[in-house]
Each structure stands twice: as structure tokens, then as C-alpha cells.
Amino acid sequence: MTDLSTLRFFRTPAHGCSYLEDRQASTLFVDPQAALSPELYSELSLLGFRRSGDYLYRPHCDSCNACIPARVRVDDFLPRRRHRRILKHNADLTVHREPARFSRELYTLYAAYINDRHGDGDMYPPSEEQFTNFLTCEWADTHFYGFREKGKLLAVAVTDQLNDGLSAVYTFFDPTLPERSLGVMALLWQIEQCQRLRLPYLYLGYWIRQCQKMSYKNQYQPLEILASGSWKEQSEPNDSGD
């Protein structure tokens, strides 16, 4: 186990929040010169850290704690009716482990996704450099899982393996196929992959109740959140019964 007290951290200046309007955000980064490894990553994930490229980070805002680390306890996960329908609809897809690096095929799908879904965000416009710097990593145990229909790439789940689970880093997919709900399908597959690997958790990143783009994560129960320094089960009512 790493002595975390020896690590150095760097905090960014305050800047506009990407998720909540009229709020200021700040991010805490692990010293990029530190000897980062999957083991250290696993330890820091228990404290709410995530990976972006070769960096480990977590929100560290002065006046806001809306970004709450979340993970699914996969052994107790029960898919909803909607989840079962989505899995059935995508049963024709095959899953392949792609090389975790830039390729023209992967980037073409990524760019189409960013252009369609994030044209008004700070990830637009996409670039090859952005793809590489955001998704690939020199030291992490990173996997690109590609979902294909008769050889055609429809979705990619960028997934990191940790000591106690998988971390769902990012998913991008063909935006012209909304009927497939490819983002949901990829997350459900990652839950199943945790079960196959006998890993107890799928780390989802940050749950933000007030942000529609991030609040969907409470659809995957049982969901645990990191609050006051410990992981606790978080439950949301499901009025739709779906």
C-alpha cells in the first residue's frame, strides 16, 4: 500500500463549472511526476479520484460538493425492465477488446459522438490529440471494448481495471442509433464484465443530482456514494416502476 501522505497534489484555479451554471469549480490533481500505477490508482479511487489521460484528479471546490463519487455494487445489481429490453435489443452485437490507443476507426466514431452530443461543450471541437490525451494512458490497465454489428463499430467503452472493480472512464457511440440506447447498453455490459471477473464494483465517476447529464447514474442500484469519507448506499425512489 502506498503512503499517500508522501504524494503531492496540485489544485487548479477556480473556473466556470462544466455541469452547473453560475458555479465555480476547482480540481485537485495528483502530481504527474509521481510514480503512478494501477495499484495507486486503485487506492485513490477509494477516495474519489478519476483518471483523465495520464492524470488522476477529483473535484475540490470551495463552496460546492455536488460532484459525488459513485459506484455500483454489481453482485446485488438487478436490471430494470428497461435495462432488460436494451440488452435484448443489442443481443446481436459482438464485443471485442480493441487496442487501447488511437486508431482512425475509433477516432471517427469518437468525433461523430462529440460533434452530435457535445457541440456546445468544452470538448468541442474534437481532435486526434484530444482523443489521445483524454482516453489513453501510459501506466493504467486500460481496455477499449468495442461493440460491433456485423463488423461495424457502433460503440466503445473505455474501461480501467482496478483492484476492486472496473472504472467506466468514458463511452462514445454512433449517435444516429438512439433506438439502441448504446450508452446504457455499454454500462450494463461493464456491470456484467465486473461480475464475470468477480470484481465487486463498477466505478461510475461523479453523480450530480442537479445535473441531468450526470444524475442518470442513480438508475443503477444498489449505488454507493462517497460521503463524509466513507462509501454508503444511496437509494432513489423509482416512481415509474421501470
Swiss-Prot record:
Subcellular location: Cytoplasm
Biological process per Gene Ontology, one example term: ubiquitin-dependent protein catabolic process via the N-end rule pathway
E.C. code: 2.3.2.29
A GO CC term assigned to this protein in UniProt: cytoplasm
Catalytic activity annotation: N-terminal L-glutamyl-[protein] + L-leucyl-tRNA(Leu) = N-terminal L-leucyl-L-glutamyl-[protein] + tRNA(Leu) + H(+); N-terminal L-aspartyl-[protein] + L-leucyl-tRNA(Leu) = N-terminal L-leucyl-L-aspartyl-[protein] + tRNA(Leu) + H(+)
Pfam families according to UniProt: ATE_C, ATE_N
Keyword Manganese listed: no
GO molecular function (one): leucyl-tRNA--protein transferase activity
Group of enzyme by EC: transferase
Keywords, sorted A to Z: Acyltransferase, Cytoplasm, Transferase
Recorded family membership: Belongs to the R-transferase family. Bpt subfamily.
Entry-linked PANTHER family: ARGININE-TRNA-PROTEIN TRANSFERASE 1 (PTHR21367), ARGINYL-TRNA--PROTEIN TRANSFERASE 1 (PTHR21367:SF1)
Function: Functions in the N-end rule pathway of protein degradation where it conjugates Leu from its aminoacyl-tRNA to the N-termini of proteins containing an N-terminal aspartate or glutamate.
Protein name, per record: Aspartate/glutamate leucyltransferase
Organism listed in the record: Alcanivorax borkumensis (strain ATCC 700651 / DSM 11573 / NCIMB 13689 / SK2)
Organism placement in taxonomy: Bacteria, Pseudomonadati, Pseudomonadota, Gammaproteobacteria, Oceanospirillales
